[in-house]
Amino acid sequence: MAFWTEKTLAEMTPTEWESLCDGCGKCCLNKLIDDETEELYYTNASCHLLNLETCSCKRYPERFEYVPECTAITVENIASLTWLPDSCAYRRLYLGRTLPSWHPLLTGSKDAMHKAGISVKDKIISEIKVRNIEEHIVLWPLKDID
């Protein structure tokens, strides 16, 4: 049996916890909140530390030094991170769902995730190149399959 089916999120080791991340890059997208409605909007503008090809953080171990507002996803804060996409493994497991068939823990690589259109690969630009963030609002990060 797989560890994510046998353990609660709180029982996982740090290595197991980190391996839940599928590396989609959606949590690294800039998000906007409407002042009036408090509705959340994703943009296709990513954190400047995100590698646009690999969908991985270029400075993961020291990311908080470069981006203080970066949020570490932990078992303690997962309930409050309602901005995480429905496809996120942390969110899925917290909500009692299973890992999707495209998840790298099940497939052995990120390829199936990229092919399913779940990741940010080939869909984003760096926030450094953005002038008007409102022009970059997108709906595709909300996609969740399986």
Swiss-Prot record:
<dbReference type="InterPro" id="IPR005358">
    <property type="entry name" value="Puta_zinc/iron-chelating_dom"/>
</dbReference>
<comment type="similarity">
    <text>Belongs to the UPF0260 family.</text>
</comment>
<dbReference type="Pfam" id="PF03692">
    <property type="entry name" value="CxxCxxCC"/>
</dbReference>
<protein>
    <recommendedName>
        <fullName>UPF0260 protein Sden_1632</fullName>
    </recommendedName>
</protein>
<dbReference type="InterPro" id="IPR008228">
    <property type="entry name" value="UCP006173"/>
</dbReference>
